[in-house]
Design a protein with these regions (language model features):
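Non-globular targeting/processing and membrane-anchoring segments
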Residues: 1-122, 136-138, 143-311
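Cell wall/extracellular polymer interaction/catalysis modules
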Residues: 133
Length: 311
């Protein structure tokens, strides 16, 4: 079939067209001009269609405002999903209390410098998208911080496929915004979840000199059990916490919506882990904010967490 389309006209047909052209002066030239314009028109239409198709593909699959987001497989979080996770009723927090959360924040010496931003105490989080312990702890941080303010531009992602607890569903704080009248939240996701050819993972964000100094000073014993672990969280220069407060394996085999639904059931293992951890995080934040807001800091769940963590 394709060979037939490429076949030239046979000799007799070609001679007939040539004779007709000679019998009618100008006819051959007129036909050539028409055919030329027709070719230009077809070529133009094809070019316009091609440009339109490319534009659609770029909009759908091409880089977002952050090309690194696309490379890491992060997707904008569904607003309904975020609303479920950040809208857990106070009664559910109170029912869970500390739950199954462990690995408590540790107090810094009174000589430690206060960590502040824009006149408010600062909660500094340092993690990475590949890290399964970061993946687990982000759930607790996101839930807890939503009691003191609000997030926007959150994206879903997973921990690395080739690490412990592979593909743990989570959120990334990269490019997320947080607004609160009580505290500032600063997040640094150092790498994506995408391996590099020479080992490690693709770089995402860099620590500034002050952040690097805090990590070097406090991400070690006696403030944590080992040196250089993540996630690392500094609560206003008052407390630090390294690692996750629960087992990331509790999230295995589940997607974001399933986990969000389980948070509404205080008897579920996931609610006991994530909400219990969120109460511990909230109790530590309350020490940064002077006990504000009162409806959070004086709630039964946060008070239970404060009692367990020595406050």
């Amino acid at each position: 079939m394709s060979h037939a389309r490429r076949q030239r006209p046979n000799g007799s047909a070609a001679r007939s067209r040539s004779a007709a052209a000679r019998a009618t002066p100008g006819a051959g030239r007129h036909r050539s001009i028409v055919e030329l314009y027709r070719g230009w028109l077809i070529s133009g239409i094809v070019a316009v269609v091609a440009v339109a198709v490319i534009a659609i593909l770029v909009l759908k699959f091409g880089p977002s405002n952050s090309g690194k987001d696309a490379a890491a497989g992060a997707q904008p979080a569904d607003p309904g999903l975020v609303a479920t996770i950040t809208g857990v009723p106070a009664a559910t927090f109170d029912s869970v209390g500390v739950g199954s959360a462990a690995n408590l924040p540790r107090a810094l010496p009174s000589t430690a410098s206060a960590l502040q931003k824009d006149g408010k105490p600062e909660l500094l989080y340092i993690g990475a998208e590949y890290c399964p312990y970061c993946a687990a702890q982000r759930w607790a941080l996101m839930v807890a911080l939503s009691r003191f303010g609000s997030f926007s531009n959150l994206h879903t992602t997973r921990s690395a496929a080739n690490d412990a607890y592979p593909n743990t569903p989570t959120f990334t704080f990269y490019n997320a915004q947080y607004a609160s009248q009580y505290l500032a939240f600063v997040a640094v996701e150092q790498t994506t979840n995408q391996p590099k050819g020479n080992g490690g993972y693709t770089s995402l964000q860099s620590l500034d000199a002050d952040q690097q100094g805090l990590l070097g000073q406090y991400d070690r014993p006696p403030y944590t059990d080992s040196v250089g672990g993540i996630p690392f969280t500094d609560y206003g220069g008052k407390y630090v916490h390294v690692g996750a407060m629960y087992d990331p394996g509790l999230l295995a085999g589940k997607d974001w919506n399933q986990i969000a639904t389980l948070l509404t059931d205080p008897a579920s293992a996931q609610a006991k882990a994530i909400l219990g951890s969120a109460n511990l995080v909230s109790a530590t934040i309350c020490r940064m904010t002077g006990g504000q807001p009162g409806n959070v800091c004086q709630s039964a769940g946060v008070q239970a967490a404060a009692a367990k963590s020595g406050g």
